[in-house]
Amino acid sequence: MVNSLVEKYSNEIAPAMNKKFNYDSVMEIPKIDKIVLNMGVGDAVSNAKNLDEAVEELTLISGQKPLITKAKKSIANFRLREGMSIGAKVTLRGDRMYDFLYKLINVSLPRVRDFRGISSRSFDGRGNYTLGIKEQLIFPEIDYDKVNRVRGLDVVIVTTANTDEEARELLTEFGMPFAK
């Protein structure tokens, strides 16, 4: 089964982008390269069980086992030593990436309270978009009753676009609900 977003990209989005930006080669047309989900768990310093719960939630959200991130430097004020586990991240590519993007746009973002669209100022200047999610409860896989702590996560959408304008157009074509 081919993902509906993959079909939409090849049949509608790529030709529309080529027409709008007038690329010399079809290989120049921007596409989504990967999506990185990152969950920083600062309270894992005092209680390692919190990190295990975050890893479990990230596994449910992404459908893939996360990589546990470690502290690069020791910071005495935070009681943090180099090499301590302080977060988890997942890199999604291919079908899983498109499945997650579809779920994010059509299911999860509409579940955010008082949702009026996502900020269009979160592009990094190189065609990548970063979205901060305040609570993991917006994802349908997370059972509200089993969550003992509300955690946020970062979603970074990495594209092959050279400019923010191209990346914004690409994500808008995919259906990202940018605030007006």
Curated annotation (Swiss-Prot):
It comes from the Bacteria. One of its GO terms (cellular component) is ribonucleoprotein complex. GO terms for biological process: translation. Keywords: Ribonucleoprotein, Ribosomal protein, RNA-binding, rRNA-binding, tRNA-binding. InterPro entries: Ribosomal_uL5, Ribosomal_uL5_bac-type, Ribosomal_uL5_C, Ribosomal_uL5_CS, Ribosomal_uL5_dom_sf, Ribosomal_uL5_N. Gene3D superfamilies: 3.30.1440.10. The keyword Ribosomal protein applies. GO terms for molecular function: rRNA binding; structural constituent of ribosome; tRNA binding. Part of the 50S ribosomal subunit; part of the 5S rRNA/L5/L18/L25 subcomplex. Contacts the 5S rRNA and the P site tRNA. Forms a bridge to the 30S subunit in the 70S ribosome. Belongs to the universal ribosomal protein uL5 family. This is one of the proteins that bind and probably mediate the attachment of the 5S RNA into the large ribosomal subunit, where it forms part of the central protuberance. In the 70S ribosome it contacts protein S13 of the 30S subunit (bridge B1b), connecting the 2 subunits; this bridge is implicated in subunit movement. Contacts the P site tRNA; the 5S rRNA and some of its associated proteins might help stabilize positioning of ribosome-bound tRNAs. HAMAP family: Ribosomal_uL5_B (MF_01333_B). NCBIfam families: PRK00010.1. This is Large ribosomal subunit protein uL5. The lineage of its organism: Bacteria, Bacillati, Bacillota, Bacilli, Lactobacillales. The gene is rplE.
